[in-house]
């Protein structure tokens, strides 16, 4: 059951695409148009410090997330009550679906995911209406 939750959470948090395609730095402005926003809130497992989690989050973003086609940008925040909010901007929904399969088996994602309390996770996918840069 925990493995299923882990896979689902990995999929939800890391909606991205095949790493063999363009990354954000190579995308034109047209390709960087946000077509989907992923918002995930969660708490960390007991004993995981914010500092430690931030290191895993940065490593996962650098080594995995930023290399995915369709990834535009990410914001990770933490509130006073230790609720984390991960906001990821994607090119389109197709990239999100493609990453579901990829994130299930990525060894680059697992260390990040193991730090998250699965029972606290809430995730939504939304189509943006207004995005101001």
Region annotations inferred by a language model:
Residues 15-16:
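C-terminal motif of bacterial Sec signal peptides marking the signal peptidase cleavage site
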Residues 54-58, 97-98, 133:
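A beta-strand edge to alpha-helix "cap/lid" segment located at domain peripheries
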Residues 35-43, 85:
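Active-site-flanking beta-strand signature of metal-NTP-handling nucleotidyl enzymes
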Residues 61-85:
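Short, glycine- and small/hydrophobic-rich beta-strand elements in well-ordered beta-sheets
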Residues 19-29:
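Low-complexity, Pro/Thr/Ser/Glu-rich flexible segments characteristic
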